[in-house]
Amino acid sequence: KPEKVVATLSSLCVEMDARYELLKAAGVRNIKEYNAKFRKRVLNPEKGHRFMPYIVVIVDEFADLIMTAGKEVETPIARLAQKARAIGIHVILATQRPSANVITGVIKANFPSRMAFKVASGIDSKTILDSTGAQQLIGRGDMLISNNSEIERVQCAFIDTPEVTAICEHIASQPGYPHALILPEPLVSGEGIDGGGEGVPFGDRDPLFEE
C-alpha cells in the first residue's frame, strides 16, 4: 500500500538523520569508520552508540508507486539517494515505464548511477541515461550503464529460478542478527508524516515478515 511505503521511507529518513548525529558524536565521516570504532569498543553503547547495519531499499516498480503517491514518495527517496550512502543506506529503483513523469528531474539528479536494458524508443533511453542508444540494444541482458556521465555497454547475466532459490537458501543459512532492525516510527500529523516514536511493534508487521 502506498501509505505504508511512504511511512517506511519517512522512517528511513529519520534513521538517516539519527545516524548522522551518531557520526558527528563519534567524530567520523562514514559508516565504515564508525563501525570500526564501535568494534574496537571506543564508542560507548550507554551513550547511545550502536553498531550500524547496512540497509538496501529496493523499489521493484517505481512507476506504480509514483503514480499513486507522487511527491510523498519522490521527496524522501530523493533525500535518501542524496545523503544516505555515507551512513549505509542505499536505494535501488526499477521500472518498466521510464517516462519523464516517472523518472523526474529530481530523481535523476540524485541517482548518478543508472542502467537501462532495451527500451522502446530513444526518448525512453534519454529519460534514463540522458542519451540515446538503449533503444538499439538486442535484448537478452544487453544493457547500458551510465555512471557519472560515462556510458558503458555490458552483458547482464541471466539467473534462473533454481539459482535464485540456491542463493536465497545460502543467505538464509548464514548467521543473522538476533532480532530485526526496528526503524523509528514516523508520526502522522496534520501536515503529513513526521519522525518520532519508538519503533514499529512486531504485531503490526506483515505475517510473513520473519520468513
Feature map (PLM): residue ranges:
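P-loop NTPase motor-domain active sites and their immediate coupling elements
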Residues: 7-211
